[in-house]
């Protein structure tokens, strides 16, 4: 689960991490009061959306007057911001964060992720702040320094000091960086996070370190023990189809293709998407109905898939292990009748009660294309979508 920047900075402040004073604003009136409270003659206005790349899209700007604040709010508030990380529709800007402008001397990068291969939380830092860190990791990996956090001992100050020296920090900056290193690591573990980024962590003109940005992603599987974080979720930033799928117990991710996919099992779902691509098609979604699929969930899955107007065909690929193919077949028939599916539906059933499932589909009288194999199913779906 993503958090907005202003929410992330509020959590940063709880852990004694240096952040700028700021106010989230939902109206121009709130914004004018905010700059009055902040004082000074320059402020930074930041559109609050989950996606990155706001700056290049114009969603982050230094403003120097009430007129510029009004202009920025009129341009973005209530509109949708399109960045390199969003689709063509963008994400809605319901809140704009106003904070004091900082005098920056140098930009650094700091981040934390879970290294699943090594089963460790990894702290990363680089002198290349304020840029796409993926490019740094790919083109100049020697500039991205990493420290693995021991799960029993936790982050140690000496590790932070060593990392600070690698970044070329000196004097009080070494102590400040060690503090940020330890507090950030503590926050990561206590809040069950899966990602933290400060891009950039800056050196101010007075040589202090300061968190100019803040990004937090919470492990969704741990939200049951973090009601305070769960309450921060902003449904408007998420695809409504994905929210509906979550309510039905389905795993759904929208994509840009035109072949809808309904599969049981994440691995089989990814394999199905791969073979569609291999046959020259483009999957419109990832959808895993899970091992306890019911008629209602199958019908719900069809509705979600068909809510995407780009879908020209649907491929249903079910391997009956825990789930019975005959129940899936009944769900498909019920869904097609209920929803009124107008696009071709290709079905491949294998495993538990697969033969009975095929009989149900054949006797339904519906225009459902039966496939003999996964490759055959992909070929027929690609042809049907043309």
Swiss-Prot record:
InterPro entries: ATP-grasp_succ-CoA_synth-type, ATP_grasp_subdomain_1, Succ-CoA_synthase_bsu_CS, SUCC_ACL_C, Succ_CoA_ligase-like_bsu, Succinyl-CoA_synth-like
Pathway listed: Carbohydrate metabolism; tricarboxylic acid cycle; succinate from succinyl-CoA (ligase route): step 1/1
Residues reported in the UniProt entry to bind Mg(2+): 199, 213
Reactions mediated catalytically: succinate + ATP + CoA = succinyl-CoA + ADP + phosphate; GTP + succinate + CoA = succinyl-CoA + GDP + phosphate
Residues given in the record as ATP binding sites: 46, 53-55, 99, 102, 107
Family: Belongs to the succinate/malate CoA ligase beta subunit family.
Function: Succinyl-CoA synthetase functions in the citric acid cycle (TCA), coupling the hydrolysis of succinyl-CoA to the synthesis of either ATP or GTP and thus represents the only step of substrate-level phosphorylation in the TCA. The beta subunit provides nucleotide specificity of the enzyme and binds the substrate succinate, while the binding sites for coenzyme A and phosphate are found in the alpha subunit.
Record's protein name: Succinate--CoA ligase [ADP-forming] subunit beta
Species: Actinobacillus succinogenes (strain ATCC 55618 / DSM 22257 / CCUG 43843 / 130Z)
